[in-house]
Amino acid sequence: YNPDQSFYSKILGQEIKYSVLLPQEYLSESTGKYGVVFLLHGWGGNQSSWGPSGLNIQSIADAQTSNGSIRPLIYIMPEGFNTYFCNRYDGKFNYMDMFINELVPLIDKRFRTTASKTERAVAGFSMGGFGALSIASQHPETFSVSIGLSPSLNTDEQYISLSQDGWNLQWGNNFGGSGQTGTGRLTSYYKSQCPLHFFKDKPSSTFQTVRYYIDCGDDEERLYAGNGELHSLLRDKNIKHEYRVRNGAHTDSYWRESMKEALPFIERSFKGENYPQETLKKFTEELHATNKNIKVGNSNIELWLPDDYNSELTYKVLYYSKGEGNVDLTTKKVAVALDSLMQIKRMIIAGFNVKEMILNETNFSAITDAVEKTVHTESNADFRLGLTYGSEADYLYNQSTGNAPAINFFFAEDADIINLSAENRAKIYYLDITDEGSNYNSIFTLFNGLRGAEAPVQYRVRNGLDSEQSAQTGIYSMSYYIGEQLIKK
């Protein structure tokens, strides 16, 4: 690792510093050529931000190379000042021109690179994530892979609402419109550089040769909204990408974890291979629970009780609302996914077909009354959890809202929720979907609304297809949070 490299840029008229990390093999032989990853820093950072005192890319890369997830690569970390790695709107500091026309050729000349776009990637966090998406999208002839970690993407509404001084410094100086308010800030130049706009304005075919990986934590202060909008936009336009939302915020530790998947994504992309789907948990039909069915009018309720159910003990009930989706996620399959939790935490599952309930005009209170007369539980919201999948998810979601919610803990797997209430009163919400799930717009809109209402919410977007096993895996991954609610008195 050498943090003290530099060259003179004729385009910018000054020295440009950069750090370089060479693989161990590079120094031990003299003929091999290597792919290159350019790493971009965040606002206020510099060429050392990916170094030992920052994200420590050497430690991450060494571990990923040792376990065979990625080949030895050259990593270049240039200083980007506070440019968003774009040309300045007035042409006075054309950083991207320097990057493409001077820095990339210089690296190919100074080091033994493959000098091919097929083995050249650009990655960045925060401001650098914005830059990584923008550079690769505008220059697909130079880059084949773009990695955005918590890219600094503001929705138009957020962009307009930023404080004047902060906006002038960080955005107006780079993209024009300094001193402007309202929609005057949304200059044509800004739109040409911002991923939320150029992905929307240009044909999808423009971006077909670049492979995108985007990751943004659900605890981000602001950026969760812009990144969620970007994922929905890319899905709507059928632009291939990998998208992740994990538990975390705008921190080095979050991005270090991101790179553990981003680097294998780069490796697969360099090979021209599709990135593999998630490794799914394998479920059997083995279930340590007993089935009991009850009727509410013309509607059926499917109960699953732990094999050691004891009517002298008090149980909490997970109400499962089964809607229509791409898979037939039965109540039994949910019980299989949560089997161990049912045994350990004294939980009963009560499942119903939501369309049947709506057709028969069966109120949720009638369901809870029938269940609470059948099993030993308590008749209050703290003893009721809700889990919904697929269509008509409003039926159960609405039980978590209002001044007297019927359920205090709400979980959703790839759910389609249309009528969002601002009165979110449940004690926890947990939303899960794969990045190729059907209801990506709906579940993100719910998350966005819950965050705006400052409701306690966990949100996950996982790698994977819209499949039965993936849905079960998502529900299984909720076990910790469901279990936490079960042990509360």
Task: Give the ranges of each region predicted by the language model.
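Non-catalytic cap/lid and distal C-terminal segments of serine-dependent acyl enzymes
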Residues: 1-489
